[in-house]
Amino acid sequence: MKNIFIAAFFLLPFFAPAQDTCQLKTATDPFTHQTKISTGFIPFTANGVQLSISVDATPTEIDFFLWFTKDQKCFDEASTIQVNFEGDRYRLNLKNTGSMNCQGAFHFSFKNSANTPPQLQRLLDKRVSSFRITGPNKTITEVSLSEEQKAQLHRMAACVVRDSKTLLKK
């Protein structure tokens, strides 16, 4: 009898429903009354650079928000980010969609639509290996992600993009 309970205990996880690793936060914008989903800020430390990354979605856009928390960096409308992918020479170059600031906030966004934009789809198909951000006066910030961080960022993007489709007006 004891062996049956032990066997059942070890087999129980195989019959339990799969856990969703997406822990997204939902909020309503007080001004536009639009629903917004977000991963919240997840801390990353990569090659000495401390930053937090959040992926958010509204009915109109999907926003990647990089916030450099240790060394306050300045960014303006002309700042760019080069996203490098694992095992691939393809690079994604995007402009800062945020406003000018010296608080270390950098945004890049994609349109939220029924069909995922090709550049965003690339972020879902391949894992990001590093970022190269060029700020004012050609200042460059390099961020190289560890294997665990690559998987975390990929999971964050996949969860938000998947659930962002539910925000679209029918």
Regions found by a protein language model. Give the residues of each.
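Short, surface-exposed loop motifs enriched in S/T, G, D/E and P with embedded aromatic residues
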Residues: D20-T35, G87-G98, E142
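An ectodomain-focused feature that recognizes extracytoplasmic/extracellular
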Residues: Q19-E77
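Secretory-pathway extracellular proteins and peptide precursors enriched for disulfide-bonded cysteines
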Residues: F14-Q19, F64-L66, L92-L94, E148-Q152
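Bacterial Sec-dependent N-terminal signal peptides
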Residues: M1-L24
